[in-house]
């Protein structure tokens, strides 16, 4: 209570002093007493603030670091008084010439520096720095020292320091000499009379520092007792936890700089010295359960005796003492110590000896002075020369003598951190005696756990750098360093899924994130160092097993640093050659501490740190740690386990670990951050690219590794691999990796990301299930991967592109089973065709070959030889065009393994166009001896050419040209050696090459391969062929059934009498192509009495007399299909209706809305239109398909099944582990109501169990069943329900809603409007079908036609008789988001007339004119002045022009097949008769409805009329 009163008095007194200043400052009164009293108040509260033991490196405003502290309140009161602050700087410091006033002002300014923005004061106020330099050189005490201290604050700004280089050079030398003088005075005074220690005991000081209670043995003791402590008392756990009740160090100070995070200290003034004593005991690690760890003297000491070592004393600046003067001089020197140009001055004037004196608390007995000296020492340690000398002269040992806990110990952390940056100095440290280095590691571990937040930060970064020294690494492991390091993040409140640090301030959250970042960075360095050690062990074991020279490791005092590429190579080597159950001690410890899940949680949570500057670095460090650890199969299996993370709403959910990695790899959270994507991909590669079976001899190679049975090794590895393949596939890994294959941004890393993704796919493709799916995707079926292989994204990254091509070729080989020949575009269909060609038996008539030879001889003027050949071979005198009379020569089929038909640069395409005579090319000279027959397929092939007057004859030529010995020129006997060509290192190699020269080809092999090339060009090659003719080009017959229906509709109609029911095989398909490629608009439905129509969805009524339309206001409107009149209107929802589905009997109707409650409802449509049941949370509902006795509703990823009669919920189908999270999930029944497809997962309705999860390849469409019940269509993928194999991919269905006709033979695909504006604009830019719908043959998924309606489509529906199609079209501008949606009714199978096109063009022009009129108000005035007669004449002329143009214009609704269109145009004469017949058919169909509910729609109309 007394403390509170004192605080209130301080605040009131400062307010009174300011009021007194307001009265007196203009009257010439002496302001020195007021300023002096203010300084005393500030200094008193500074000492109170320091008693709370805040982080000494925390440079925030005290009121921000501790909102309850009085010092912060006093500083805010001062800074709010602008007049006083301006007078303090301008009048009392800059312009006043009165030394007492200057002194008082400088003292106050120095006191308020913790809350002052120094850059503003010293940069904006011209002349103040010059005054301070002048006083620091010439003024009397204490102004001289105050000025020096203020200059220290000014020089922290680098711009100011750079502007005053000369002044600083002079002043540094002056103050260093002053320090030397003051030091000598201290030594002299000590010799005269020993200064008593701040802590006096009856005998000797408690702190002879080598006997400090917390000595170098603390680390060993911590290792021994830590497990027992965790069991007995969590309050004393050796950990660093933010603001936690069981924190060993109670320093809870907030974050400061990005590299020096701090934590908040909640100070309670009520407890006074007793509370401070308790906190100090906590810092020392005291525990009532462990009294042996401390000395009795220290535990019995009061806080007043301990405080001088922990927080220091003498915060007052007056009277000036040598200790205060030295402290302020060191504050000035600290920011200047890092400048290279001042280093000679520091070295010359003995800064090292001075610092060695000041960091010795036995010499100074002033912890504040020692702390300032340590800060200055840290800045000097940045220089290599100084650091080397400091280490050589025992400086490290001096640092280790500083007691813990104390403010000076926190200063040691910065010195160690800066020392670690100097590799030469650290090597010298590592060469110290073992006990010294052990003390360094132990001291730093204590700092990491029990120091202030800045000390923890410095210690963590020290280890990050020093893990490259094996000596430090070994000691770190000996003292259980990994557990103590992991504790830093395991105890962070921001990783607590329950509250996520909700009670923390922004500064505390920032500090926690900094801790996570630094810890992950240290963990990455730790495991990289251990990875190199493990690699050495494996290599040495291999060398012992297989022989060879042992590689000696680098000395432990030498730093080992590795590039990212080297780390990747190490991981690949261990995965490839390590044992199946690799035992790795650090990984085992990490696994035991459950740190894999911890890192996954950190990655997941850090992805949402949008405002944290180092978010990307934190995630990348954590990913790199996991990448290294996944060389161990145990860790890989951890990624297949569930992890608790937060969803978008902040709720805890369970997800598979690998899905987090895949999400990061996809770029879901970090757009265009290539480093993060590469790190995530490396994890996936390590998990899926391990060897199928490992070298068995490695299973027992490491000392300390248990021996394993060799037979179990491949089995275990295969089990792990298979599980990882499965978990990556089930978490949509195929989709992620495929999307990364076509990545183009960031352009500098796209090629490398492609290569890594392709490498992961190669490993994943060893799974037969994955291989089957990939083989059906456009990547292979449409040769997309070959297109990607042609050019790199960035030409400068060709080396990465070469790797991508290598992996892509391997992927093709795995999926197709055939090796890829580089330079060819190979799809699976081509490879299968090449396989058939390779197995074909090639034969040709022998006499045709002899005829070709004879013709060639005649063309060369060798008539007699040709005559002899004709006579001996009994050849006809004229060239035969038919080969049936000749005996064929048979060539054996090529081996089955022939991958493809050979292609050469000037191949088929170039030779098809050439016209040459028969036999234009032949061997120049026959070989001296008949060569042996070469193997089949060893030569490239020529292609055919066409002779001018003869029948089509292939040109046969040798590709390999040979020099002729008789070329008509004199042969040169002597010739100098060529200076180019191949080079042989020795004659032996040359002889070896000569022995391997290929034999010259035979004529038979040339012709055989030439014919095989012809055969390969067939569209559908067959394995068994008749003899090939050399005179006519070969062509395999097209596969065609005997009863194939003709393409011409008239012929097909005539053949129905012979081949019912479609005129032959495929007649129905041809009919569908004819009918569903023609759509004629017949009417438009608009909302009556509305400026803009707002229809959102449509459906035909049960008897199809009415068109049911939902509006954006939630109304349901019924329009007569034939008259176009609105017959009824109902209010169903308060928001836009998105879905309508009437039951087949017409008695019920389902509706869904966007946001109003209920979201969906079931309505009765008998005599009264009323709501039967509501489905409050389901955004989409539909009837069961077969019996329509149930309703299935969709709420996000969850499917609900309801009973229609009672409205009760029967089933809920959802499994969070299987969720695909499609954005537009719509659950649906299969045609027999036994199965449900929800969120891409197939469910059994009877058992309510998930059967299969289909792979995800898109973000939006969840899929529908095909009416045949055998297939599932999910966006572009067609899946077989019997085998779950991927059957086809239909790229044209991408992002389209699929609607089947009543018979299930035709499906419509339309790109629907997006739900929100951002997606809407994105889809308009992305989709070529945003304003069109397409029709497909539902039996083979071949496209029939694309119908461009020139408007964005909201919905479409078809009637049961395939007569009409209703489409909701947006009449608004394509570039705007305004809605004017109408329903346009199309007649199916009718061709659009030219006058319809003209009318539509006129309508478009009128709409465009109206838009122009609305945009320009001035135009309306001009239009009023125009003559109406002239306007009418202009319109008539325009109509005539449009009619003439329309006759020759293109048909907007043209079918996809041009040939079919031409055939249809020929049959236009009979269209009138056909239309009459169609009308009769419609009437007949309309009268055949014999349903019991056939009069329901009539009842509705009658009731409405009543």
Curated annotation (Swiss-Prot):
Widely expressed. Expressed in oocytes and zygotes (at protein level). Disruption phenotype: Early embryonic lethality. Conditional knockout in mouse embryonic fibroblasts results in severely defective progression through S phase and subsequent apoptosis. Conditional knockout in B lineage-specific cells arrests B-cell development at the pro-B-to-pre-B cell transition: mice display modest reduction of D-J(H) rearrangement, while V(H)-DJ(H) and V(kappa)-J(kappa) rearrangements are severely impaired. D-J(H) coding joints show longer junctional nucleotide insertions and a higher mutation frequency in D and J segments than normal. It catalyses: L-seryl-[protein] + ATP = O-phospho-L-seryl-[protein] + ADP + H(+); L-threonyl-[protein] + ATP = O-phospho-L-threonyl-[protein] + ADP + H(+). The modification Phosphoserine is found at residues 202, 254, 827, 894, 897, 978, 999, 1327. Pathway: Protein modification; protein ubiquitination. It is an enzyme of class 2 (transferase). Residues 924-943 have a biased composition (Pro residues). One of its GO terms (biological process) is proteasome-mediated ubiquitin-dependent protein catabolic process. Its EC number is 2.7.11.1. Changing residue 1282 to A: Loss of interaction with DDB1 and strong decrease in TET2 monoubiquitination. Residues 241-275, 916-946, 977-999, 1392-1506 are annotated as: Disordered. Belongs to the VPRBP/DCAF1 family. The protein kinase-like region mediates the threonine-protein kinase activity. The DWD boxes are required for interaction with DDB1. This is DDB1- and CUL4-associated factor 1.
């Amino acid at each position: 209570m007394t403390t509170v009163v004192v605080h209130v008095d301080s605040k009131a007194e400062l307010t009174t002093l300011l009021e007194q200043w307001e009265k007196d400052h203009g009257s010439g009164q002496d302001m020195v007493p007021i300023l002096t009293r203010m300084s005393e108040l500030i200094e008193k509260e500074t000492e109170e603030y320091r008693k709370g033991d805040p982080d000494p490196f925390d440079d925030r405003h005290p009121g921000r670091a501790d909102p309850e502290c009085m010092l912060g309140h006093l500083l805010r009161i001062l800074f709010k008084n602008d007049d006083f602050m301006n007078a303090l700087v301008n009048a009392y410091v800059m312009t006043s010439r009165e030394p007492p006033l200057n002194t008082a002002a400088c003292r106050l300014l120095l006191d308020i520096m913790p809350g002052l923005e120094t850059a503003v004061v010293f940069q904006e106020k011209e002349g103040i720095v010059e005054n301070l330099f002048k006083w620091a050189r010439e003024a009397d005490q204490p102004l001289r020292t105050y000025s020096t201290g203020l200059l220290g604050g000014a020089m922290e700004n680098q711009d100011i320091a750079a502007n005053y280089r000369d002044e600083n050079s002079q002043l540094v030398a002056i103050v260093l000499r002053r320090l030397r003088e003051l030091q000598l005075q201290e030594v002299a005074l000590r010799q005269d009379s020993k200064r008593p220690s701040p802590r006096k005991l009856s005998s000797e000081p408690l702190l002879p520092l080598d006997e400090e209670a917390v000595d170098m043995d603390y680390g060993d003791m911590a290792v021994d007792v830590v497990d027992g402590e965790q069991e007995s008392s969590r309050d004393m756990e050796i950990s660093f936890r933010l603001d936690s009740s069981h924190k060993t160090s109670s320093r809870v100070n907030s974050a400061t700089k990005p590299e020096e995070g701090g934590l908040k200290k909640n100070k309670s003034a009520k407890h006074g010295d007793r509370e401070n004593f308790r906190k100090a005991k906590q810092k020392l690690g005291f525990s009532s359960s462990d009294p042996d760890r401390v000395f009795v003297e220290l535990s019995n000491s009061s806080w007043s005796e301990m405080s001088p070592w922990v927080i220091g004393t003498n915060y007052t600046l007056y009277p000036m003492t040598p200790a205060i003067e030295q402290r302020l001089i060191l504050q000035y020197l600290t920011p200047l110590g890092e400048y290279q140009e001042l280093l000679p001055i520091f070295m010359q004037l003995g800064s090292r000896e001075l610092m060695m004196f000041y960091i010795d608390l036995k010499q100074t007995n002033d912890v504040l002075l020692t702390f300032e000296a340590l800060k200055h020492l840290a800045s000097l340690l940045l220089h290599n020369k100084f650091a080397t000398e400091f280490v050589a002269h025992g400086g490290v040992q001096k640092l280790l003598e500083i007691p813990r806990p104390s403010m000076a110990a926190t200063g040691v952390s910065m010195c160690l951190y800066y020392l670690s940056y100097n590799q030469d100095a650290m090597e010298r440290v590592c060469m110290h005696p073992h006990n010294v280095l052990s003390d360094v590691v132990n001291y730093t571990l204590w700092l990491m756990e029990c120091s202030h937040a800045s000390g923890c930060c410095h210690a963590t970064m020290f280890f990050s750098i020093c893990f490259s020294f094996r000596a430090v690494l070994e000691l770190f492991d000996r003292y259980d360093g990994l557990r103590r390091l992991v504790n830093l993040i395991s105890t962070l409140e921001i990783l607590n899924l329950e509250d996520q640090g909700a009670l923390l301030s922004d500064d505390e959250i920032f500090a926690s994130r900094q801790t996570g970042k630094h810890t992950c960075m240290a963990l990455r360095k730790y495991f990289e160092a251990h990875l190199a050690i493990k690699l050495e062990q494996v290599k040495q074991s291999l060398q012992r097993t297989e022989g060879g020279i042992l590689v000696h490791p680098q000395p432990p005092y030498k730093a080992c640093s590795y590039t990212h590429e080297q780390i990747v190579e190490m991981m690949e080597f261990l995965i490839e050659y390590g044992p199946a159950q690799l035992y790795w001690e650090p990984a085992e410890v990490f696994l035991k501490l459950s740190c894999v899940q911890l890192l996954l949680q950190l990655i997941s949570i850090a992805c949402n740190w949008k405002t944290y500057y180092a978010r990307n670095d934190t995630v990348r460090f954590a990913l790199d740690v996991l990448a290294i650890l996944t060389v161990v199969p145990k860790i890989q299996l951890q990624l297949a386990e569930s992890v608790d993370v937060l969803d978008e709403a902040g709720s805890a959910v369970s997800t598979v670990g690998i899905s987090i990695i895949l999400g990061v790899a996809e770029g879901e959270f970090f757009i265009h951050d290539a480093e993060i994507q590469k790190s995530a991909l490396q994890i996936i590669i390590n998990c899926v690219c391990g060897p199928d079976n490992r070298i068995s001899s490695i299973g027992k190679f490491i000392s300390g590794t248990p021996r394993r049975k060799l037979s179990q090794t491949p089995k275990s590895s295969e089990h792990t691999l298979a599980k990882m393949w499965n978990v990556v596939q089930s978490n949509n890994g195929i989709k992620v990796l495929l999307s990364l294959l076509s990545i183009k941004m960031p352009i500098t890393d796209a090629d490398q990301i492609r290569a890594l993704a392709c490498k992961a796919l190669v490993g994943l493709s060893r799974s037969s299930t994955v291989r089957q799916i990939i083989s059906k995707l456009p990547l292979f079926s449409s040769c997309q991967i070959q297109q990607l292989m042609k050019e790199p994204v960035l030409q400068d990254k060709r080396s990465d592109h070469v790797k991508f091509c290598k992996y892509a070729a391997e992927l093709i080989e795995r999926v197709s089973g055939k090796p890829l020949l580089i330079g060819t575009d190979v799809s699976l269909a081509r490879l299968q065709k090449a396989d058939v060609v390779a197995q074909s038996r090639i034969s040709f008539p022998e006499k045709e070959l002899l005829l070709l030879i004879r013709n060639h001889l005649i063309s060369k003027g060798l008539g007699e030889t040709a005559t002899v050949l004709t006579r001996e071979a009994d050849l006809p005198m004229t060239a035969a065009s038919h080969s049936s009379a000749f005996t064929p020569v048979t060539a054996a089929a090529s081996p089955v393994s022939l991958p493809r038909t050979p292609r050469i640069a000037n191949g088929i395409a170039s030779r098809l166009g050439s016209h040459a005579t028969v036999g234009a090319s032949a061997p120049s000279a026959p070989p001296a001896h008949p060569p042996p027959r070469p193997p089949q397929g060893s030569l490239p092939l020529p292609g055919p050419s066409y002779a001018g007057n003869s029948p089509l004859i292939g040109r046969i030529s040798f590709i390999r040209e040979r020099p002729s010995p008789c070329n008509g020129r004199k042969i040169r006997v002597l010739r100098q050696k060529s200076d180019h060509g191949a080079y042989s290192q020795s004659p032996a190699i040359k002889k070896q090459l000569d022995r391997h020269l290929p034999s010259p080809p035979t004529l038979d092999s040339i012709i055989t391969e030439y014919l095989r090339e012809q055969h390969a060009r067939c569209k559908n090659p067959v394995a068994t062929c008749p003899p090939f003719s050399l005179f006519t080009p070969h062509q395999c017959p097209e596969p065609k059934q005997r009863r194939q229906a003709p393409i011409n509709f008239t012929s097909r109609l005539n053949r129905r009498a012979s081949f019912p029911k479609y005129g032959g095989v495929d007649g129905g398909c041809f009919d569908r192509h004819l009918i569903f490629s023609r759509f004629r608009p017949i009417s438009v439905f608009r909302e009556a009495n509305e400026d803009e129509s707002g229809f959102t969805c449509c459906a035909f009524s049960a008897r199809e007399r009415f068109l049911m339309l939902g509006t954006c206001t939630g109304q349901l409107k019924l329009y007569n299909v034939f008259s176009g009149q609105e017959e009824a209107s109902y209010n169903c929802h308060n928001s836009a209706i998105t879905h309508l589905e009437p039951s087949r009997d017409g008695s019920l109707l389902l509706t869904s809305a966007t946001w109003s409650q209920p979201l969906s409802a079931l309505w009765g449509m008998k005599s009264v239109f009323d709501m039967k049941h509501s489905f409050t949370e389901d955004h989409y509902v539909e009837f069961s398909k077969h019996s329509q006795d149930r309703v299935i509703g969709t709420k996000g990823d969850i499917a609900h099944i309801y009973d229609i009669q009672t409205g009760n919920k029967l089933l809920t189908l959802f499994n969070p582990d299987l969720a695909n999270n499609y954005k537009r999930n719509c659950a649906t029944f299969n045609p027999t109501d036994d199965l449900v497809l929800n969120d891409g997962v197939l469910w059994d309705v009877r058992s309510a169990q998930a059967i299969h999860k289909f792979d995800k390849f898109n973000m939006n469409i969840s899929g529908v069943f095909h009416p045949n019940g055998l297939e599932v269509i999910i966006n572009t993928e067609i899946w077989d329900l019997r085998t779950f194999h991927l059957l086809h991919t239909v790229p044209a269905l991408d992002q389209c809603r699929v609607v089947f006709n009543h018979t299930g033979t035709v499906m419509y695909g339309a790109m629907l409007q997006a739900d929100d504006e951002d997606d809407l604009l994105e889809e308009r830019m992305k989709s070529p079908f945003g304003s069109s719908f397409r029709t497909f043959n539902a039996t083979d998924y071949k496209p029939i036609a694309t119908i461009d309606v020139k408007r964005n489509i909201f919905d479409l529906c078809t009637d049961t008789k395939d007569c009409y199609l209703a489409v909701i079209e947006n009449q608004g501008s394509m570039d705007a988001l305004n809605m004017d949606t109408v329903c346009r009714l199309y007649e199916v199978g009718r061709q659009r007339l030219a006058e319809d096109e003209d009318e539509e063009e006129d309508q478009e022009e009128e709409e465009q004119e109206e838009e122009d009129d609305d945009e320009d108000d001035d135009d309306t005035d001009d239009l009023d002045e125009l003559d109406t007669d002239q306007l009418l004449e202009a319109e008539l002329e325009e109509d005539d022009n449009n009619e003439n143009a329309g006759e020759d214009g293109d048909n907007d609704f043209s079918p996809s097949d041009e040939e079919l269109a031409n055939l249809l145009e020929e049959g236009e004469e009979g269209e009138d008769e056909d239309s009459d017949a169609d009308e009769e058919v419609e009437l007949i169909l309309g009268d055949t409805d014999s349903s019991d509910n056939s009069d329901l729609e009539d009842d509705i109309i009658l009731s409405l009329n009543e």
